[in-house]
Amino acid sequence: MLLLGGGAIALPAQSGVQVTPMAQAILLASRSDPVPLGGALNELRVVQPILTLDARALRGLLIGTGTLNFEAVTMPGGELSSAVWGEGFVDRRHPHTVVHELNIAGVDLLGGLDGRGRIGVVLGKGFVPFGTDDPMSRWLSRYPVNHHLAQIVERAIAVAQYDVGKVTIEGALFNGDEPERPDQWPLIKQQDGTWRFGDSWSARLTLRPVAGLELQGSQANAHSPEHRPGAGGDAVKSSVSARWKDSPHWGERYLLAEWARTSELEGTFVFQSVLVEGMLRRGRWSGRFRLERTDRPEEERLDDPFRSRRPHLENSILGISRWSLNTLGLATDLARPGGMLQLMLFVEGTFGQVKKLDDGIFDPIGLYGTTSVGELRIGFSAGWGMRNHRMGRYGVLASAHADHDASGMSNH
């Protein structure tokens, strides 16, 4: 076994095969005020503990991606995080499935027959080609409120890609249902013979007009995402974004602006999000920010006020809230910036407002006792090789346009 540059491992018994291990985890102390039923809450947890293997063969024409996520062990009750929601959790971020990604991609299937173009295919489990990068591979430890509006995660996917020059087109079929618990796999086919896989689709166009700039537009239709048996309605989703990332001699710069929209029950419920975030690093110190305004469905909650009913139908939506939040962060590298090992101390503060957006019965004063939102997070992150990984970028995007200077969450 031979360790190559960039952390890749060459397997001598299988010439041309390289395996790149990546890992990260964050020890996080947080305080949220308010929480459901009023008051404040403090927590100490390990969040985002993952192990990823990137395997490449046939000179990079065959790429395998596998990621294990251990949040089911370190945060089975979710991560305290005001306004965040999804998969039956509210004001807590849900633990991801244990097998977070497991897929294989073929790149440039036609070789030189299609000229400068390259055709790719991705099969397995992972991120649907829709929206922006997963927050786990971005600069703030806190997930945005719009995670389930701006990304579609942990599905069985069949993706076709075409890449030529500065343009990449992707189309995918996937199962509409999202996971209900960390050990659950995507539902491929129901007992009555109805296929869940293939009942939903997405398409994404990515443009790279100049070095460092990436423009993205995508559309998706997810069938019954919150009702696994498929009795729910469709979620029609749209996303547009612009991303800038470069690395001048003195450090790094990053900026993302995105708009996302999800419509349910043919426009009966519409949720929109606008988000801008950025980072500036000079030497060992970096500052980061996020400005977000996102609409959230207010669902029927259980006796545990941090949990909502599953399986979920649209008639369980009690209203729509709008969260306008601002997050500022400061971090310092304890290891050499740009190296494979990442060790970082960080602090993040979030403040903002929540308001009722429609005529539903949801009342923020009644639930939280206030419309003001505040959160403080102090953490230590450790990682290996995560700078080279933009989670959810498969096939032709992983092989030719991976952002090898992009930071993973080990750079909090």
Stretch-by-stretch model annotation:
Residues 49-57, 102-106, 158-164, 171, ...:
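Residues on the lipid-exposed face of transmembrane beta-strands in outer-membrane beta-barrel proteins
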Residues 25-31, 57-61, 68-74, 125-129, ...:
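Transmembrane beta-strands of outer-membrane beta-barrel pores
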Residues 368-412:
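Outer-membrane beta-barrel "beta-signal"
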Residues 60-64, 111-114, 119-121, 129, ...:
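Repeated loop/turn-to-beta-strand initiation elements of outer-membrane beta-barrel proteins
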Residues 43-49, 95-100, 152-158, 163-165, ...:
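Residues that define the transmembrane beta-barrel architecture of outer-membrane proteins
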Residues 164-168, 172, 204-320, 324-326:
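Detector for outer-membrane/organellar transmembrane beta-barrel domains
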Residues 9-109, 373-377:
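Beta-barrel outer-membrane channel/assembly domains of diderm bacteria
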